[in-house]
């Protein structure tokens, strides 16, 4: 799994990224290796390793991440045709960076899991 410092640097704007949304709680930016015409990563502005580390004190961040994902889907005009929201957890779940992040994908018909 990759080091999480890349996300920290994006949040602090120390490295270039196409940030589409940022507030005091989260940052959302375009994936540099998109899997769909719209591929946005949504991350907390504070470190959480994976969804396994969600607890009573920080569970509110998931709600905010989903809320902003829907807001961005509307902004990108993919909300009517449809989109996918994914959170990978740990190695077997496909998580590549040791930092909780949500993928928002859309802009084309996505393959089903069947």
Curated annotation (Swiss-Prot):
Disulfide bonds: none
Coiled-coil parts of chain: none
Gene Ontology molecular-function annotations: catalytic activity
Ranges for domain HIT: 6-114
Domain of life: Bacteria
Pfam family, one: HIT
Cross-referenced CDD domains: PKCI_related
Stretches that traverse the bilayer: none
Protein name: Uncharacterized HIT-like protein BU357
């Amino acid at each position: 799994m990759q080091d999480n410092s890349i996300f920290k640097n994006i949040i602090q704007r120390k490295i270039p990224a196409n940030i589409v949304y940022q507030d005091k709680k989260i940052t959302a930016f375009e994936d540099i290796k998109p899997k769909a015409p719209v591929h946005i990563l949504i991350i907390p502005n504070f470190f959480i390793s994976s969804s396994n580390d969600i607890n009573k004190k920080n569970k509110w961040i998931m709600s905010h991440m989903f809320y902003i994902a829907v807001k961005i889907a509307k902004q990108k005009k993919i909300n009517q045709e449809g989109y996918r929201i994914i959170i990978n957890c740990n190695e077997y779940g496909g998580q590549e960076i040791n930092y909780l992040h949500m993928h928002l994908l859309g802009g084309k018909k996505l393959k089903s899991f069947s």
